[in-house]
Amino acid sequence: MSLLTLKNRRERGFFDGQFLIAMPGMEDRNFARTVIYICAHSDAGAMGFVINRPQSLTFTDVLLHLDMIKQEDSIVLPKRAREFPIQTGGPVESGRGFVLHSDDYSSDSSIPVSDDICLTATLDIVRAISKGDGPTRATMLLGYSSWAAGQLESEVVNNGWLTCPANEELIFDRSLDDKYERALAGMGVTAAMLSAEAGHA
């Protein structure tokens, strides 16, 4: 599923607004120990973002790459901009940036993905954040995760993923190292429990 499909969708799918939490046996290195926020799901497929993978680039690096600032300007960026988090959202279009954010910021290109969360993928929001403005809560993700028609359903049925309602606090929490464990804890399980169950299946 693409961003265009997300923008043109009319109905929410079953996995919309859900977390996918990778089972301990996930072999795909792109998704091992990941928590994914599903933004769109329909008969055409699904699209979402990994929310617990760090990215080596900083927001300053992004601004420099986009020629929005010069190197000497980086030291005068607002503190909020200097510390703005960048994460790896998935293996599809990994050079493209997307901003998941609270709905207190909106532009013509912003796409509502839930009652409280929007997705914007244009330079307007990058400029706003660079000035210390923009949404109250946000994170930039490079790349996204995508599934073809029926693919996600098949992976869930085959015990590739656990699913649960998404938690906004966890989406925007900047502590990534233990986010996987906290997502599991929210379901009342641990990775060790799941590994033991798989071993006795």
UniProtKB/Swiss-Prot annotation:
SUPFAM superfamilies found in the cross-reference section: VC0467-like (SSF143456)
Any one GO cellular component localisation term in the record: cytosol
UniProt-listed InterPro entries: AlgH-like
Family note: Belongs to the UPF0301 (AlgH) family.
Name the UniProt record assigns to this protein: UPF0301 protein RL1035
Organism: Rhizobium johnstonii (strain DSM 114642 / LMG 32736 / 3841)
